[in-house]
């Protein structure tokens, strides 16, 4: 992977695409050799033109020249010939231009090979996935961005609880898991495979945790709504109870008032009856007394 290769050379970070020959990629040894040759030629040319006797004597000594000729015999001879025939500035400029031309030529071949393999924008996007990334550092950045996007999608899905965002996040996770499985299958290091396995397990556990949190949130909302409904029903029952109690008190007061009124009416009727009875008894006694007197008079006359 790109994130695990810290401390390697710049050429080792470049990964060939599928189908691209590794010969198109300049190796680290070739680049170092070109750089050393160019540096040596430049130093020799500067020493030859400056006329410094001591330094040129040291570089021209037999022992030093023998050591250099053991490493690069052809390069040393070629540098000596060029130093004798061409000026110092021209030699340095020509060496730099030659090295730059070789680098540009190799880079052009590399770009042409990549363009031939990629072809279109969609294929370029597919080529920049983790399995076929050109640069390991770029691949690590792309994976970090994808993980950040997945984290944002997960937070949005938890906050909004929308099925569309959850499905998109699940598709991202499935795609990333498939790519990491392919990369784990291609690698030969068992430690990388165990790391990838642990990462997959961690992602699965995180997804299960998110699902459990969503279910718990739903249950909490349902319990809160049920509690609110129960409290509203209790409040309604309390208000109805208070209304019934108030009506009962009103009816009780009305019954007491009616009972008192009926008692007064009964007492008044009893008084009227008693008064009317006394007045009716006195005329009857007078008539009886008159009849008895008339009957006695009639008897005396006879």
UniProtKB/Swiss-Prot annotation:
Record flagged with keyword Transmembrane helix: yes
Keyword line: Coiled coil, Endoplasmic reticulum, Membrane, Transmembrane, Transmembrane helix
Subunit structure: Interacts (via C-terminus) with both 22 kDa and 19 kDa alpha-zeins. Interacts (via C-terminus) with OP10 (via N-terminus).
Name of the protein in question: Protein FLOURY 1
Coiled-coil intervals: 199-254
Pfam families registered for this protein in UniProt: Zein-binding
Topology within the bilayer: Multi-pass membrane protein
GO MF entry, a single one: myosin XI tail binding
Residue ranges crossing the lipid bilayer per the database entry: 27-47, 82-102
Residues covered by the GTD-binding domain: 193-299
Origin species: Zea mays (Maize)
GO cellular component: endoplasmic reticulum membrane
Tissue: Expressed in endosperm. Not detected in embryo, leaves and roots.
The keyword Ribonucleoprotein is annotated on this UniProt entry: no
Residue spans of biased composition, Acidic residues class: 172-192
Gene name linked to the record: FL1
Function field: Involved in protein body development and 22 kDa alpha-zein localization.
């Amino acid at each position: 992977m790109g994130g695990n290769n810290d401390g390697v050379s710049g050429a080792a970070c470049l990964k060939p695409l599928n189908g691209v020959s590794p010969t198109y990629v300049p190796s680290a040894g070739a680049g170092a050799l070109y750089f050393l040759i160019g540096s040596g030629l430049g130093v020799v040319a500067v020493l030859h033109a400056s006329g410094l006797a001591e330094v040129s004597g040291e570089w021209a000594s037999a022992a030093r020249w023998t050591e250099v000729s053991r490493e690069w015999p052809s390069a040393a001879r070629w540098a000596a010939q060029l130093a004798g025939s061409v000026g110092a500035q021209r030699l340095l400029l020509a060496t730099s231009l030659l090295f730059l031309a070789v680098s540009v030529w190799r880079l052009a071949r590399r770009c042409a090979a990549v363009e031939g393999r990629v072809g279109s924008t969609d294929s370029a996007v597919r080529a920049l996935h983790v399995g076929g990334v050109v640069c390991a550092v770029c691949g690590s950045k792309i994976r970090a961005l994808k993980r950040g996007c997945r984290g944002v999608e997960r937070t949005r899905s938890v906050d909004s609880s929308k099925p569309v965002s959850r499905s998109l996040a699940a598709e991202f996770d499935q795609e990333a898991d498939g790519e990491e499985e392919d990369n784990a299958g291609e690698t030969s290091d068992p430690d990388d495979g165990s790391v990838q396995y642990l990462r997959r397990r961690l992602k699965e556990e995180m997804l299960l945790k998110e699902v459990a949190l969503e279910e718990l949130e739903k249950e909490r909302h349902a319990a809160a709504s049920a509690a609110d409904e129960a409290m509203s029903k209790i409040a309604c029952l309390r208000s109805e109870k208070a209304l019934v109690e108030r009506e009962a008190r009103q009816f009780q007061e009305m019954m007491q008032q009616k009972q008192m009124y009926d008692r007064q009416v009964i007492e008044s009727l009893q008084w009227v009856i008693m008064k009317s009875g006394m007045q009716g008894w006195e005329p009857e006694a007078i008539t009886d007394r008159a009849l008895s007197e008339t009957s006695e008079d009639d008897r005396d006359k006879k």
